[in-house]
Amino acid sequence: MPRTNPKTSNFDIDLDWAAVYEQEVVDMFEHNGSIEVKAERDQWLRTGNIAVELYRIYKEDNRKAYTGITISDAYWWNISLVKNNETKRVVIIKTKELLGLVKKFNREKKYKIRAMGDKDSKFTTYGMLIPLWEIMEFENIK
């Protein structure tokens, strides 16, 4: 991953401070940071929501299996917002913070856990639809 070269950069104000966060992004993709990547297809543009998968129920035996964010070991959660098969925006949030928002919204009954996904599969996936603005809402940032 290319790094900013302090000798050729004209952005020298707060360069040392910014270098810490540049390294954080490098670590996220190259080193000790783990990142789960999810892509939201076109529908996010119409609804303004992202889907956060939580679990699935198998139709043959009604067994519940936790999936998605509930079992992820990733430190970061990447949400690629795709339109016409092209990534238009990327939102990156700490996995534990996004899971915390899901739990908070469920406790407050603000957004419901609902069935989502392919109806013809052997299981039904459940998750929460969260408006994108909620992720960026200042009061939700811990």
Residue ranges and their predicted role:
Residues M28-F29, G33-R46:
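Conserved catalytic cores of phosphodiester-cleaving nucleases, focusing on short active-site segments
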Residues D16-S34:
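N-terminal domain-onset segments
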Residues R3, K7-D16, K64, S80-K142:
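Non-catalytic C-terminal interaction segments of nucleic acid-processing enzymes
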Residues D42-T70:
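Mg2+/Mn2+-dependent nuclease catalytic core
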Residues E24, K38, Y55, D120-K122, ...:
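Intrinsically disordered, low-complexity regions of eukaryotic proteins
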Residues N32, K64-Y66, D73-W77, T87-K88:
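Short, surface-exposed beta-edge/turn micro-motifs
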Residues L45, T70-S72, N85-E86, N106:
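A generic structural signal for short, non-catalytic loop/turn and secondary-structure boundary residues
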Residues E36, E53, N78-S80:
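Residues in well-ordered beta-strands of folded domains
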